[in-house]
């Protein structure tokens, strides 16, 4: 299904560059549309930097707990330190979802319309008009 929508600012892609541009354009009162084929936040937020750093952070915490088994720093842990991988993945997914919803909310309150889908055009040019 194709849809025609006129606007003053069209942003293709809701990654870190796209959503920041759309938020600012919306804050300036421009009729802004941002088109994203996946989730708002882009690769960095959805499957790159943020999820990777969450998993690295959790693994570092796990390693630090393991050091306390022998009373390191006067802290003792009784029993084995265990990792529940499904729970860890769920925790990471919750972080990603929360940040994704945060980006969508920022777009909404700025007045930028997020359209989930792919942007296509048969035109080979973009017409620029003075605002």
For each of these PLM feature ranges, what is it?
Residues 17-21:
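Short glycine/serine/threonine-rich phosphate/pyrophosphate-binding segments
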Residues 3-7, 23-30, 35-131:
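Glycine-rich flavin
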Residues 13-16, 37-38:
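Glycine-rich Rossmann-fold phosphate-binding loop(s) that bind the pyrophosphate
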């Amino acid at each position: 299904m194709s849809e025609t929508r006129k606007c003053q600012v069209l942003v293709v892609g809701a990654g870190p560059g796209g959503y920041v541009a759309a938020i600012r354009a919306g804050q300036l009162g421009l009729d802004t549309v941002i088109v994203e084929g996946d989730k708002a936040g882009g690769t960095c937020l959805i499957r790159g930097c943020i999820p990777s750093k969450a998993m690295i952070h959790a693994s570092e915490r796990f390693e630090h707990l393991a050091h306390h088994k022998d009373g390191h720093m006067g802290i003792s842990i009784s029993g084995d330190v265990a990792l529940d991988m499904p729970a860890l993945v769920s925790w990471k997914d919750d972080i990603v979802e929360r940040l994704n919803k945060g980006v969508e909310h920022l777009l909404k309150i700025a007045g930028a319309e997020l359209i989930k889908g792919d942007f296509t055009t048969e035109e080979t040019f973009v017409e620029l008009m003075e605002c």
